[in-house]
A protein has these predicted regions:
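Post-Walker A helix-loop "phosphate-sensing" segment adjacent to the P-loop in P-loop NTPases
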Residues: 458-468, 486-487
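Hydrophobic positions on the alpha1 helix immediately C-terminal to the Walker A/P-loop
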Residues: 451
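Conserved lysine of the Walker
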Residues: 448
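Extended, folded cores of ATP/NTP-driven motor/assembly subunits in large transport
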Residues: 1-403
Length: 781
């Protein structure tokens, strides 16, 4: 027998004692606050790792992931046993309702909150409803806890590095988190009741097992009853010669509470080589003896029997894997436990799982009279009581790939649809990201406006955050007026209109550094919108000088500075170019766009402000967009000082990058939004125009949240290159239905489906399809 295996079996050897109570069945002797458990004579620690997009990856990417996972398996310590566990946990409805549904507020908007909550409940009911968690548990024999801590500190750092190479995040579980995993399995349906306080436990003299164990355990030859639930432990008895990498995914793609564990015992290479050489020597001896017998019978042309030849060939290949291909010998045990509400359901589910295994030419079998041992083996405790070992190489073990698809289910998140692969809800909390900048991209008719309105509706109904919207197509006013009631104002910007905005308005703290310099940059952008020849160095100097003089006069007189004041100051200057700039600004002061040249006449202090620039026409929209962005920047600065979050939505975002100066100003404003607790969202259908600008491309690539709906062919190619998305993943934005596409959330890429029920008042407010809803502007000002 291999020395490592012999030592392992010796360490695991334990005298059987009849359990006198339910707690005795749980094999954990002691726990420490940092998550280390003592199980028998060994110490164990569990780490949780996140899923990666393996199923939707390209063939090349899958190969890279496979090699990276193989490298992780190769790095496992031969002195320890490693258990990889996939835990399917059903979403608790009570917890779901508490964490996701909107609370009623007793106002006129409760009717919309009920509609939204009902939509979420319907989606959750029709969805998979299973949360899949993945753990890796390392157990090792050490003399004392200090040695164990030192060992796990080193192993933990190694695991985190290797999982990071895969694109997965690996984190340690402390005692409370690990006990919660066990509690949620032993006491299914009572997940919300878990509470563990070590100080309180010691003060009361309780055992930690009291907090997790079921009320009762009953065993029979082929199943267990834990409280009111039935469970059955299976093990992989027979392996196929060739196994697909989708086998584990298919076994766990099951809408039930279940666990699957792979126990791995790595064998040191020198022992493995010695073992295989001995086996090969035995085979060669058998072949030699067989040939000697044939020669004794004068049969000198006899061919070596096929089974002997096959044994020799496989042994040589195995030895070659160990010595030249850096493979390791691994001993593996695969076990799984399925649970059900009654025995009949358990039998039916067992047959379903057995059929999946048969499909892959493997045989799963029920552990007869070993159910308790099997249960303790499959749970992420750190013990192994089943010795149905199968000898594998690193590559053949890596075929049991635990990865499937990334899920985004953040606590306190906002609903963005359901995962197109797992059908679980996608809940995104942008506060968890490195930055909160967002882009919403898609061709006309792909559902951009609807997606933006759905997010705005959630923010208005469920938060107290301010919402500022730049609306070039008169689409958002009705929604804001209906949901905002007294807290919303819709500003109609049109040539000769009564609503005016002061383009020179500037709050205390405006800009990143020098506010006068920032405002000068804004004025240059404004002039450039009129004079397509651009702003030269001489004009820049004049604008900078006059802007400073205007604000000095405003500070002295106590009157707000306006574009009229700036134009008058320009006319006072001796340079001829100053007169030219003044002539350019005439449009905004005494011309048809004087709505930006005087003091503001609108209420900018409301919680929801919609800037409707539809009336400006196509030629003047970029100018209106610039002034509104500057106004929004002032509001974000004020909110930042109050400690309030602001959400900014800017439609037709691409137009501001048609000119150099306006692009520079907008890039600066975008940075300031992020730094001042602003959550900016850019919406555009012209992705190609956006990507032609270096600044806009940089903003897009640096954004942590990007929603991609159906994309044109040329846009797909550019987005794929910019965001490093595979062709397989880009297929989700190719001829996609409205509301379907791909979400880039931090490092995660999740295909999604988002269809809102049409028989609701919210749908009527959000849709832009002719004849289906309210398409136009409300007036809540």
């Amino acid at each position: 027998m291999i020395k490592t295996l012999k030592n392992l079996l010796k360490q695991d050897k334990k005298r059987y004692t009849v359990p006198r109570k339910v707690q005795d069945v749980i094999p954990v002797r002691r726990i420490w606050k940092d998550g280390i458990f003592q199980v028998g004579s060994r110490f164990s620690k569990t780490y949780q790792f996140t899923d990666i997009n393996y199923l939707v990856a390209s063939r090349e990417d899958k190969e890279q992931m496979f090699l990276a996972y193989s490298e992780l398996l190769n790095s496992l310590d031969s002195g320890a046993t490693t258990k990889i566990t996939i835990n399917n946990r059903r979403l608790n409805r009570a917890n779901f309702e508490q964490s996701i549904l909107m609370p009623m507020r007793g106002d006129a908007c409760d009717v919309y909150r009920r509609e939204y909550n009902q939509m979420l409940l319907d989606k959750a009911t029709s969805a998979n409803g299973i949360i899949q968690e993945k753990y890796i548990t390392v157990s090792v024999w050490k003399k004392d806890i200090e040695e164990a801590r030192t060992y796990f500190a080193r192993i933990g750092a190694d695991l985190i590095t290797h999982f990071a190479a895969l694109g997965s995040k690996c984190t340690e579980l402390d005692a409370a988190e690990k006990l919660r995993v066990l509690h949620d399995f032993y006491r299914q349906g009572e997940e919300a009741a878990f509470h563990f306080d070590p100080q309180d436990m010691m003060r009361k003299g309780h055992d930690f097992k009291d907090y997790i164990c079921p009320d009762s355990m009953e065993k029979s030859s082929g199943c267990l009853k834990l409280g009111e639930k039935y469970c059955r432990v299976l093990f992989l008895k027979d392996y196929a010669s060739y196994i697909k990498d989708s086998m584990v995914t298919e076994l766990t793609d099951f809408n039930r509470n279940m666990m699957l564990s792979i126990d791995v015992v790595p064998i040191p290479t020198d022992e493995a080589v010695r073992e295989v050489e001995n086996r090969l020597l035995g085979i060669e001896t058998n072949i030699t003896n067989w040939q000697r017998r044939q020669n004794a019978n004068n049969n000198f042309s006899a061919v070596v029997p096929y089974d002997m030849e096959l044994q020799r060939k496989e042994s040589k290949e195995f030895l070659d894997d160990l010595t030249t291909r850096d493979q390791r010998m691994m001993l593996a045990v695969i076990t799984m436990v399925i649970t059900a509400d009654d025995k009949k359901q358990l039998d039916s589910d067992t047959e379903t799982v057995l059929a999946v295994a048969r499909k892959h030419m493997c045989q799963l079998a029920v552990l007869k009279f070993q159910q308790f041992d099997g249960l303790n083996t499959v749970l992420p405790i750190g013990t192994r009581r089943i010795n149905a070992f199968r000898t594998l190489t690193t590559e053949s073990l890596a075929v049991f790939m635990p990865f499937k698809v990334q899920e985004v289910q953040d606590k306190g998140g906002i609903y963005f649809g359901e995962n197109a692969i797992s059908h679980n809800l996608i809940m995104c909390n942008k506060a968890n990201l490195l930055n909160q900048s967002a882009f919403l991209l898609g061709v006309p008719g792909s559902g951009k406006s609807f997606s933006a309105k759905e997010l705005i509706a959630f923010l208005i109904l469920d938060t107290t955050d301010d919402v500022l919207i730049c609306d070039p197509e008169n689409e958002f006013g009705a929604l804001a007026a209906a949901l905002g009631k007294e807290t919303a104002t819709v500003i109609h910007m049109a040539a000769g209109g009564k609503d005016r905005l002061n383009a020179m308005y500037m709050v205390d703290g405006y800009g990143e550094n020098n506010p006068i310099v920032e405002k000068s940059q804004f004025i240059m952008s404004l002039v450039e919108q009129i004079d397509k020849a651009g702003v030269g160095p001489q004009q820049k100097s004049i604008i900078d000088r006059c802007t400073a003089l205007v604000y000095q006069d405003a500070e002295r007189t106590g009157k707000p500075a306006t574009l009229c004041d700036l134009r008058n100051k320009l006319l006072e200057q001796p340079e001829e170019k100053a007169k030219e700039i003044a002539l350019s600004l005439e449009l905004f002061t005494t011309g048809s766009l004087d709505i930006f040249g005087h003091e503001s006449t609108v209420d900018l202090d409301k919680r929801i402000v919609v800037f409707d620039i539809h009336g400006l026409g196509e030629q003047l929209k970029p100018t209106g967009l610039l002034v509104i962005t500057d106004t929004i920047l002032n509001r974000v600065t004020l909110n930042w000082k109050k400690g309030k979050r602001t959400h900014i939505f800017i439609d037709e975002f691409h137009v501001v990058f048609e000119n150099e100066q306006s692009g520079i100003f907008f890039n600066s404003a975008w940075r300031q939004f992020r730094k001042r607790n602003g959550y900016p969202t850019a919406i555009t259908q012209n992705v190609e125009y956006l990507l032609d600008s270096v600044q806009a491309s940089t903003m897009l690539s640096n954004s942590e949240f990007v929603v991609m709906l159906n994309q044109a062919f040329s846009d797909r190619a550019k987005l794929s290159k910019l965001l490093n998305i595979s062709d397989e993943q880009m297929s989700y934005v190719t001829n996609a239905d409205a509301g379907c596409g791909l979400i880039k959330y931090g490092s995660a890429l999740v295909p999604f489906i988002n269809r809102f029920p049409k028989d609701t008042e919210l749908y009527r407010l959000m849709t832009t399809r002719p004849g289906e809803g309210v398409f136009g502007s409300g007036n809540a000002s």
